[in-house]
Amino acid sequence: MENPQVCECYHGDVEEEKKKKQNNTTSPVHVVLKIDFHCDGCIARIVRLSRRLEGVETVRADPDSNKLTLIGFIMDPVKIAEKLQKKSKKKVELISPKPKKDTKENNEKKANDKTQTVVAVTTVVLKVNCSCDGCIKRIQKAVSTTKGVYQVKMDKEKETVTVMGTMDIKSVTDNLKRKLKKTVQVVPEKKKKKKDKDNAEVNTKVGSPCQPGNGCTHGIGPYRFMEGPMTGFFSEEDQSYCSVM
């Protein structure tokens, strides 16, 4: 824009309720916002939206610096900026007065809480008599309309309905009973079988399989002692002759 223009508009008639709120503050507040102005129509639209905000009496738009000044008995400048951003669908930045650190920390905590909130998805199996296609359609419609239901699976042979989502199980069963006028049972989950430790055999013997109980010999047999008279080692004819030799 070649010729910067300053648009100043005054809010005329003020309702009595707004006057009572204005009396709570001693002096008007100057709120400076940064917003992108594209054309004259954009300026007029933003000024018109700003005049409708609570507590705003005077609006000054400076297209050259992309600043919008709101003057009035404004209780919360942060909320004013948020409302204007929501209505104008443009990015609005609060320049002054600067928000307190406490409000910034609270907003950051709220944002973190929203991102960290994880909803647990549960799966429940219901036993319902569904003998015909009409019953199946009615069951699917009744379950799918329940709040928090993500997925519905039907098993006609087993007559079971598997429901997945963040719903309340009691609300699902009550809804089915009321709409179908049939008995609805919750199928309990199967518990995993524990291993029988008593039947497990524990080998406590030490030694090789061929020689149990003799200990580890590392391939060398145990030492043996030859019993008997020493004369057995010698010849009967010549006792000085050694049979070992």
From Swiss-Prot:
Organism (species)? Arabidopsis thaliana (Mouse-ear cress)
| Cleaved propeptide residues | 243-245
Region of interest called Disordered, as start-end residue ranges on this chain? 91-113
Composition skew (Basic and acidic residues), residue ranges: 99-113
Q: Which family does it belong to?
A: Belongs to the HIPP family.
Q: Lipidated positions for S-farnesyl cysteine?
A: 242
Sites where the protein binds a metal cation 1: 39, 42
State the superkingdom.
Eukaryota
Cysteine methyl ester is carried by which residues? Answer: 242
What name has this protein been given in UniProt? Answer: Heavy metal-associated isoprenylated plant protein 1
UniProt KW keywords: Lipoprotein, Metal-binding, Methylation, Prenylation, Repeat
Write down the PANTHER family for this protein, in alphabetical order. HEAVY METAL-ASSOCIATED ISOPRENYLATED PLANT PROTEIN 1, HEAVY METAL-ASSOCIATED ISOPRENYLATED PLANT PROTEIN 6
Binding positions for a metal cation 2 per the UniProt entry: 132, 135
GO-annotated molecular function? metal ion binding
Per the entry, what this protein does is: Heavy-metal-binding protein.
The HMA domain, residue ranges: 28-92, 121-188
Supply the InterPro entries for this chain: HIPP01/3/5/6, HMA_dom, HMA_dom_sf
